């Protein structure tokens, strides 16, 4: 019975992650439609931030293309 107390927080975390995943997918698709790509925290060299994909991902666009 004690394992239920240990599993309950993990189940809540999984449910919370699943609830916000559809919103992140929409932002990612919007970034890709604008000829951008998602990167973790910062854009690589020769690209600029043009929006956000999720909490820790930014939408980047290359300067050369």
From Swiss-Prot:
SUPFAM superfamilies: Defensin-like (SSF57392). It comes from the Eukaryota. Residues 61-65 form a propeptide. Its main location: secreted. The keyword Isomerase does not apply. InterPro entries: Defensin_beta-like. GO terms for molecular function: CCR6 chemokine receptor binding; chemoattractant activity. It is found in: Secreted. One of its GO terms (biological process) is defense response to bacterium. Keywords: Antibiotic, Antimicrobial, Defensin, Disulfide bond, Secreted, Signal. GO terms for cellular component: extracellular space. Pfam families: Defensin_beta. Disulfide bonds join 31-53, 38-59, 43-60. Residues 1-25 form the signal peptide. Belongs to the beta-defensin family. Bactericidal activity; inhibits S.aureus and E.coli. This is Antimicrobial peptide THP1.
């Amino acid at each position: 019975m004690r394992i239920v107390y240990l599993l309950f927080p993990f189940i809540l975390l999984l449910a919370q992650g699943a609830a916000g995943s559809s919103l992140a997918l929409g932002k990612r698709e919007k970034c890709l439609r604008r000829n951008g790509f998602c990167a973790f925290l910062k854009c690589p060299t020769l690209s600029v931030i043009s929006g956000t994909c999720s909490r820790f991902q930014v939408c980047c666009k290359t300067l050369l293309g």
